[in-house]
Curated annotation (Swiss-Prot):
InterPro entries: CEBP_ZZ (IPR032296), CEBP_ZZ_sf (IPR038446), CPEB (IPR034819), Nucleotide-bd_a/b_plait_sf (IPR012677), RBD_domain_sf (IPR035979), RRM_dom (IPR000504). Residues 1-32, 513-533 are annotated as: Disordered. Keywords: Developmental protein, Differentiation, Repeat, RNA-binding, Spermatogenesis. SUPFAM superfamilies: RNA-binding domain, RBD. The lineage of its organism: Eukaryota, Metazoa, Ecdysozoa, Nematoda, Chromadorea. It comes from Caenorhabditis briggsae. GO terms for cellular component: cytoplasm; neuron projection; nucleus; synapse. Residues 521-532 have a biased composition (Basic residues). This is Cytoplasmic polyadenylation element-binding protein 1. PANTHER family: CYTOPLASMIC POLYADENYLATION ELEMENT BINDING PROTEIN CPEB, CYTOPLASMIC POLYADENYLATION ELEMENT-BINDING PROTEIN 1. GO terms for biological process: cell differentiation; meiotic cell cycle; negative regulation of cytoplasmic translation; spermatogenesis. SMART domains: RRM (SM00360).
Amino acid sequence: MQHQLKACGDVKTSSRAQQNHRRSTAASAKRSVGAGNSFLATDVTNLEMNSNFMTRKLKKNGNGVIGSPLSNGYFGAQLTANSFNYTPQANPYSNLDFQMAMGSGDVPSLMGMPVHKPSMMLQSDPSMDLTQFTEELQAIQNMPFQPISSSQAALQAFLAANEAASIGSYGFSKSQMLPSNSMRVSGARKNRIVEVKNQNDRLFLVLSDPQASVSTRPTLVPLTRPLQSVAQSCLDLTKKQPFSTEPLYSRKVFIGGLPIDVPDEEVYVTFGSFGKVLIDWPRRPEHNGRASDMYESEMGRRNLRSVSGYVFLVFTHEDSVQDLVNACEFYDGKYYLQLSSPTMQDKAVQVRPWRLSDIDYFSEEKVTVDPRRTVFIGGVPRPTRACDLARSLQDYYGKVSYVGIDIDPELKYPKGAARVTFATAQSFVRAISGRFVQVTHAETNKRVEIKPYVMEDQYCDECEGDLCKHNYAPYYCGDSSCLQYYCEGCWDRMHYEMGQSRADHRPMVRTGDQTRILPRPPHHPAAHHSHQRPQYLLHQDQLDNHHSSRGNSSVISRIVNRNSATMLDHVPGKPFSAISASYGY
């Protein structure tokens, strides 16, 4: 025990004890037993055994080790910039025996290796900085994906196959069904056209890029697990539901409540089994301007969390939507379907189809639609039905005879706007004067703006085309005191020459599908317009511009003031004419 303590440096050794230790070491070689093996001596410490063993090995290789003459005080020295140093550690081998062993070379190589001493004059190599490796390791550990269990060689052999019949068996785990290139680095998901095909009693998932050329071959992925995460009872119920030959839904379906970390392949398999479908992920702005690409993985993980958990499905055939709706569970007026992710098992996601019967609303079977009593409402929430919008307007302004939701002509999906026709002129005037309405549907509650519906191909209401050579009227006055279409001459005569009560009215024009309010008639030059308008009206325009800069004006005022600066400086070379647009109900 005394020799072990001395070897570990825990006891200060005297000179007499050192001489006794050398004698005992020499005597132990003579008293050793066991066929001349010196390591069987009872008074030989473990340190001496390792020293003797390493000494023989080093002498055989010819690589003697000389101990470092540096003291521990060097480790605490302050170095220059970009130089590295180490924190001083306590040396457990501080006795004289160990110092003599270092001088003689009778120590293992690791214990006798000279300490690395950076130069005080030279800059250190940047490759010695281990900070970047630490950050990259943390980023890799935090990435939200798992390695694919199948080998890369088998995957490449599968993708290189020319025919589906020649593809060998290839299994995928439930959470990883696609190759490693499907893992998102920047958090952006890619749109894919998905279709499930059966060939030779084997199921394959066909993936294609909607923006790729016709010559681009789709990707085939074999399926070795059930098609979808839907309960078998729901699948059996789908077959029992009556199928309508008439279209009932739009081919575009909204899926909400998706888990943030749901794999793309899980969405492909779940919804691709109902038919050929385009998976349309919502688009998010790219995050550019990063200082370095070192944090690419970490930034991708953050962006992935910020993506909303919803997706749009565009099926090729309408009957696929009926199958999807029949497979859902109906609860509290909503459709739900189960979907799994690495962190959530069988989560209920909302399936929101759009019924074609919700596009129009008629108060009576035979109702007359008067365009002169029609208003345009933009920013309508997409789930809002025509009957819901009619109910909201009737509570505020009066009876509504017709409501039409603007839809995409191909997909028949809402575009976020509507046209409403009131039953009486009084209700129409009240709606124009009120300008806003609160639309409530399910969990949505939004305040939208009401504007007169401006039509194309309308003659002037004052001259009926006699003073403008029977050209269509380019302006519409949406003020409650006018509500008429005007040609250029009648606009000046009714708003400036007949009196100043209407001089502050602003013309409304139809531009495509939008209705815009202009700050002045476009056929007036800036100087001519400012000369005819009174000073108090010009002051009022300055106040409007001031309020719009503060962000307190309406949507229409912001549009007008945004374009006023360029329009005042530019004199049109020819009379203004509205852009042609089709009109119909």
